[in-house]
C-alpha cells in the first residue's frame, strides 16, 4: 500500500488497524509513491504530536541553512534531531568511479514540473548521506561504464523527491525504475542497458508469479507504467519512543522485486541492514 493519496493510499487502510482503540492510527510522515518500507504511525494524538515534532525540528534546522560564521560552514544539530533517523536502500545505475561513501549537499526547488536542483534564491537546503552497500561484478557493467550498485541513503533533510533527485543529479547514479528524474529524456522503457532491462522485467514477472499476480494489471502497474518498478525502499527507521524515550528501531525486509533484482545482478546483501 502507498502512503500518498490516490491508488490504495495508506489512509484507506488505517481503519483496519484500529483494533480496540477509539480511532484509527494516524500518519506521522509520508513516503513517495511506489517507495516501499517503513512508515511511522501513531496510536494517540499526543504521540503523533511528539513524533511529528521530530520531523518539524529537522525541517526548521534545514531551513536555516549553513552558518557562514562557522569556519567549517556547518552547524551543530539540536539534540532532538537525533530522535528520528531514516535509512533507505536504492538500486542504482552507478558510474564505476562512484566513491564508497559521501554526502550530497545540493539545494532543491519545487516547480509545477517537479523538483529541480537550483542554488540561490528560492532554493531549500537539502543534504543526503550515502554509502555503497554492494557493487555488481565488472562483467555486468555497460559499455558506458555503468554498473548496478545498492546504496544506503540517509536524508539529513526531508525535501520532496530528495533522494531521487540527488541520486540522478549530483551522484550521477539514477535509481532503477525512476522515470521522472532518472530517465526523463528517454522513453519509459529506456534509460537502462538492454540486458539489465530484460533481466529486471524477468524479475518483475517472477515477482508477480510469487505474489499471485501473474499477467494482472494491478494498481502498482497503473501507477508506474510499463517499465520496471521503482527500486527505492525505506529500509530502517529509528526514533525515540514518545512516552518512554527509549530507542525504537524497525527494519523492513526488501520487497520481492528488489531482493530478486539484487540476486539476479549479483549484489551481496550480507552484513547488517546498512547505514549511510
What are these regions (language model features)?
Residues 18, 154-157, 167, 254:
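Non-cytosolic beta-sheet module surface loops
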Amino acid at each position: 500500500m502507498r502512503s500518498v493519496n490516490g491508488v490504495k493510499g495508506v489512509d484507506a487502510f488505517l481503519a483496519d488497524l484500529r483494533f480496540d482503540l477509539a480511532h484509527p492510527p494516524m500518519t506521522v510522515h509520508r513516503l513517495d509513491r511506489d517507495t516501499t518500507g517503513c512508515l511511522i504511525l501513531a496510536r494517540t494524538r499526543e504521540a503523533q504530536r511528539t513524533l511529528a515534532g521530530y520531523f518539524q525540528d529537522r525541517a526548521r534546522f534545514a531551513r536555516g541553512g549553513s552558518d557562514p560564521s562557522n569556519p567549517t560552514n556547518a552547524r551543530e544539530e539540536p539534540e532532538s534531531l537525533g530522535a528520528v533517523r531514516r535509512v533507505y536502500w536504492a538500486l542504482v545505475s552507478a558510474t564505476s568511479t562512484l566513491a564508497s561513501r559521501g554526502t550530497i549537499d545540493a539545494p532543491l526547488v519545487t516547480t509545477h514540473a517537479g523538483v529541480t536542483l537550483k542554488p540561490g534564491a528560492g532554493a531549500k537546503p537539502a543534504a543526503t548521506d550515502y554509502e555503497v552497500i554492494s557493487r555488481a561484478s565488472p562483467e555486468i557493467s555497460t559499455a558506458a561504464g555503468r554498473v548496478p550498485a545498492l546504496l544506503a541513503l540517509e536524508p539529513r533533510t526531508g525535501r520532496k523527491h530528495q533522494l531521487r533527485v540527488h541520486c540522478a543529479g549530483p551522484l550521477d547514479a539514477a535509481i532503477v525504475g525512476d522515470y521522472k528524474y532518472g530517465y526523463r529524456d528517454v522513453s519509459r522503457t529506456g534509460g537502462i542497458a538492454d540486458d539489465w532491462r530484460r533481466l529486471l522485467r524477468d524479475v518483475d514477472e517472477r515477482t508477480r508469479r510469487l505474489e499471485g499476480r501473474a499477467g494482472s494489471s494491478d494498481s502498482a502497474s497503473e501507477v508506474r507504467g510499463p517499465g520496471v518498478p521503482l527500486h527505492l525502499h525505506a529500509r530502517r527507521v529509528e526514533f525515540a519512543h514518545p512516552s518512554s524515550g527509549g530507542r525504537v528501531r524497525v527494519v523492513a525486509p526488501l520487497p520481492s522485486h528488489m531482493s530478486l533484482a539484487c540476486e539476479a545482478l549479483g549484489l551481496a546483501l550480507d552484513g547488517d541492514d546498512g547505514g549511510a
